[in-house]
Curated annotation (Swiss-Prot):
Molecular function terms from GO: 5-amino-6-(5-phosphoribosylamino)uracil reductase activity; diaminohydroxyphosphoribosylaminopyrimidine deaminase activity; NADP binding; zinc ion binding
Residues binding substrate: 173, 189, 209, 212, 300
Residues forming the catalytic site: 57 (proton donor)
Domain named CMP/dCMP-type deaminase: residues: 6-128
Organism of provenance: Chlamydia pneumoniae (Chlamydophila pneumoniae)
Name of this protein: Riboflavin biosynthesis protein RibD
The protein's role, per its UniProt record: Converts 2,5-diamino-6-(ribosylamino)-4(3h)-pyrimidinone 5'-phosphate into 5-amino-6-(ribosylamino)-2,4(1h,3h)-pyrimidinedione 5'-phosphate.
Pfam families the UniProt entry points to: dCMP_cyt_deam_1, RibD_C
Protein keywords: Hydrolase, Metal-binding, Multifunctional enzyme, NADP, Oxidoreductase, Riboflavin biosynthesis, Zinc
SUPFAM superfamilies: Cytidine deaminase-like, Dihydrofolate reductase-like
Catalysed reaction, written as an equation: 2,5-diamino-6-hydroxy-4-(5-phosphoribosylamino)-pyrimidine + H2O + H(+) = 5-amino-6-(5-phospho-D-ribosylamino)uracil + NH4(+); 5-amino-6-(5-phospho-D-ribitylamino)uracil + NADP(+) = 5-amino-6-(5-phospho-D-ribosylamino)uracil + NADPH + H(+)
UniProt-annotated binding residues for Zn(2+): 55, 80, 89
Residue span of region Reductase: 151-376
Binding, NADP(+): 159, 175, 201, 205, 230, 302-308
Gene: ribD
Length: 376
């Protein structure tokens, strides 16, 4: 393992930071940042903003204030080595005769997978790998997981009262948390490419499930709303079927044919699966999302869906918001019966906690040996 200086770590952390600017718009590509340094001074920066657009390295070179020959380049993910919508970034760095390249992470995508690093070294460029590795892994976690497992990273998000109730006695769950927490949820939605919701939540709250900025404006890229409804119980007039964001309706043979025709007239695509004891076939849903190269799935309820996903081991992370209220025993828990005894309960790792206004956000991660999905 290389020993890197604090200054070198600073430059890599800057590359990771600017890479986050593409977090919402870059998927299914990774949100990569690049910094060009000459004589310990940043002369160029760039990040990958959208699929099909210029890569971080190309933009950093374009934005450089002087020729970059002999410079050091810091990039949060291995430069690509293949021809796609853009030429290989490794070739670009070779062409501009950079001196050294610092890479936080090897790209697990089979199209790259160390080949970019090999190309640079074959051209006589010094390459150092692993600087800022943990920070880059945290930033690119959904991308890394999807490219490694060919499966989306799944976050179960919920808002609950201090005493753990996710809804009141009438089943209403909106406005449990403060505005600051709801703004954070809007960003979390924007960072996801799909939102899963069960029919009961739609019937109770009639949510939009759109990703909105604090000022109320929509984020430039909206997630796919995936409505799971095995019997056709969600009214076609529900807000999730409006044109603000794309929607996928998932159902079973129990759904009336006339209902599907109505959705067809609204241009809402329908995915038919076999019936299961918990409703729709979640494995078929995830197969569909994997085919669409969805990197991150956000689950927004309700209790039945949460329970099914945890039992089937689809959930990787929990994001829990606690609101400033006590609802009492409403029989509205976050999760239903899992059948766990204390000694066999899923181990969680606390990743972070944050005060948002008058609410508390806590992020937990389920241990890797637990969250590998059970494949049919």
């Amino acid at each position: 393992m290389e020993d890197f200086s604090e200054q070198q770590l600073f430059f890599m952390r800057r590359a990771i930071e600017i890479g986050e600017k593409g977090r919402i718009t870059a998927p299914p590509n990774p949100w990569v940042g690049c910094v060009v340094v000459q004589e310990n001074r940043i002369i160029g920066e760039g990040f990958h903003a959208y699929a099909g657009g210029p890569h971080a390295e190309e933009l950093a070179i374009q934005n450089a204030s002087m020729p970059i020959s002999g410079s050091d380049v810091y990039v949060s993910l291995e430069p690509c080595s293949h021809f796609g919508s853009c030429p290989p970034c490794a070739n670009l760095l070779i062409k501009h005769k950079v001196s050294r390249v610092f890479v936080a992470l090897v790209d697990p995508d089979p199209k790259v997978a160390g080949q970019g690093i090999a190309m640079l070294r074959q051209a006589g460029i010094q390459v150092y790998v692993g600087i800022g590795e943990s920070e880059a892994q945290a930033s690119l976690q959904p991308y890394l997981y999807q490219r490694t497992h060919n499966f989306p990273w799944t976050i179960l998000k919920s808002a609950a009262s201090v005493d753990g109730q996710v809804a009141d006695s009438q089943g209403k769950s909106q406005w449990i948390t403060c505005p600051e927490a709801r703004h954070d949820v809007g960003k979390l939605r924007a960072e996801s490419q799909a939102i899963l919701v069960g029919s009961r939540t739609v019937l109770s709250d009639d949510p939009w499930l759109t990703a909105r900025q604090p000022q109320g404006m929509l984020y430039p890229k909206q997630p796919l709303r995936v409505v799971l409804d095995s019997r056709g119980s969600v009214p076609p007039t529900s807000k999730v079927f409006d044109k603000t964001s794309p929607t996928l309706y998932v159902t079973t043979e129990r759904c009336p044919e006339n209902y599907i025709k109505v959705l067809d007239s609204l241009d809402v695509p329908v995915l038919l699966t076999e019936s299961t004891p918990s409703g729709v076939d979640l494995h078929k849903v995830y197969e569909y999302l994997a085919q669409k190269k969805i990197l991150q799935v956000l689950v927004e309820g309700g209790t039945t869906l949460h329970t099914s996903l945890l039992k089937e081991r689809f959930v990787n992370s929990l994001v829990l918001y606690s609101g400033p209220m006590i609802l009492g025993d409403q029989k509205r828990p976050l999760v239903g019966v899992l059948g766990n005894l204390l000694e066999s309960a899923s181990p969680l790792t606390l990743k972070s906690s944050q005060i948002l206004g008058n609410s508390l956000k806590v992020v937990w991660e389920i241990s890797p040996q637990v969250f590998e999905p059970i494949r049919n």
